[in-house]
C-alpha cells in the first residue's frame, strides 16, 4: 500500500473526498472521464455537475437535510462552500446556478497543490493505492463490470431529469410569483395555476402519452424523491395534486384563493432567464413532453432548452458490503462514496464523500478510520446505510426518522429543534478530532 489516494469519479462525493483528503496533507489523484467521455445525463465538462434538480433542498434545521448542510459547513465542506457562493433564489431551499457551481468546484480542485486531476475513463481499480470509488449513478460500463466482480450484482433503477424552459417564452399574464407560505423572499417561484378542468385534461394527457421504454435487462425501481411525473399520475388521478402540483400555501393574487392545482417553476440560473419545472422528472418522449407540458397555463409557447430524460442509477448493497467507515468489508483499502453507496441526494452524496475522504487520509497516516456520532445527521445516515436490512435495502435520504430518540419528554413541536441542537453539539465535539 502506498501513501497516495486514488479517487475515481469527479461528482459531488468524489470532489468532497478529494478536498478533505488533500486539506489533511495527503496527495490525491482524481480520475474523471469527462470531457473525453460523457454519460447520457451529463453535459458539462466541469466537475461536480448537478444532473437532476439544481436544488440542494431545504435550508431550515426543521428538515434533516438542512441540518446536514450545517454540519458540512462547520466541517469545511467544499460542496457547501460552492453552493453558498453560487445560490439562486429558491424560497426556503438552497438552489444554485449549476454552471457556476461546477466552475467553483473545478477551480478549487484544479488549483490545489496536492491534487492531480487526470482526465480520462478508468476501467479498473488500482491494486495497491487506497481507493475511493465515487463513480455515481452513471458508472461507465467497463468500471461497472470491475465493481461487480468485487461486490456482486448491482441493482439498477432510474432517476429522472426535469425540463427547463426560457423565462421569455412564458405568458406572465397567466403566471404569478410566490413562494409557498411566503418563504424566502416570497416570490422566488413562478406558479402556473390550473383549474379542475385543466388539471383533469392534463392528467388524461399524461396517462395516454408515449413513454421511452426501458430495455429488457434494466430493472426499473424509482426512488420516491425523483419519481417520474407519469409514474405519479398512474398511481391515482389526485396523486399529482398532492405531490408536485399541490396548491397549498399558494393563493392566486387574482382570485385570493388557492387554485385546484399549481405547477411551480424554479430559477435555473442567477439571471432568471431559465426555469425548471419542479417535480417534473419524466421519461415521456420528447414530442409528448412538448405537447403535454405546453398544456400548462403560461407555457403554451414555452421554449424548452432541455427536455426531461431518464438515466440509470447503480448502487451497491451497502449494508452487505460496507463498514460504517465506508470501507469495503472484503478489502479495507477500498472505500465507496456517493450515490453508489445508496445515499440519495446531492447533500447526502457530499456527506458520504466527506467521510470517505477523511477516512482515506487517516488510513494513509496510519490512523484508525472514524464514524460520526449517531446523533448527527451524517452519523445517522451512515449508520442506516451500512446497517439496513440487507434483503430489502433501498436508497435513503437523510431524515429525522433515522436519529436516535431524545432523552426525556419533549413537545412534538420542539422535537426537531432539539434533535438539531444535540446534533450540532455532537458534531462540533467530533470534528475537532478528525
Swiss-Prot record:
What is one GO cellular-component annotation here?
cytosol
GO terms under biological process:
tRNA methylation; tRNA wobble uridine modification
Principal localization reads cytoplasm
Q: Gene3D superfamilies, from UniProt?
A: FAD/NAD(P)-binding domain
Location in or out of the cell: Cytoplasm
Q: Which cofactor does it need?
A: FAD
Range of residues in the leader sequence:
none
- The superkingdom listed in its UniProt entry is Bacteria
For this protein, what is the EC number? 2.1.1.74
* Recorded catalytic activity of this chain's protein: uridine(54) in tRNA + (6R)-5,10-methylene-5,6,7,8-tetrahydrofolate + NADH + H(+) = 5-methyluridine(54) in tRNA + (6S)-5,6,7,8-tetrahydrofolate + NAD(+); uridine(54) in tRNA + (6R)-5,10-methylene-5,6,7,8-tetrahydrofolate + NADPH + H(+) = 5-methyluridine(54) in tRNA + (6S)-5,6,7,8-tetrahydrofolate + NADP(+)
- The kind of enzyme this is, by top-level EC class, is transferase
Record keywords: Iron included? no
Q: Which UniProt keywords apply?
A: Cytoplasm, FAD, Flavoprotein, Methyltransferase, NAD, NADP, Transferase, tRNA processing
Q: Which GO terms describe its molecular function?
A: flavin adenine dinucleotide binding; tRNA (uracil(54)-C5)-methyltransferase activity, 5,10-methylenetetrahydrofolate-dependent
Kindly list the positions annotated as binding FAD.
Answer: 9-14
Family label: Belongs to the MnmG family. TrmFO subfamily.
HAMAP family referenced in this protein's UniProt entry, alphabetically: TrmFO (MF_01037)
Q: Provide the protein name.
A: Methylenetetrahydrofolate--tRNA-(uracil-5-)-methyltransferase TrmFO
Organism in which the protein naturally occurs: Geobacter metallireducens (strain ATCC 53774 / DSM 7210 / GS-15)
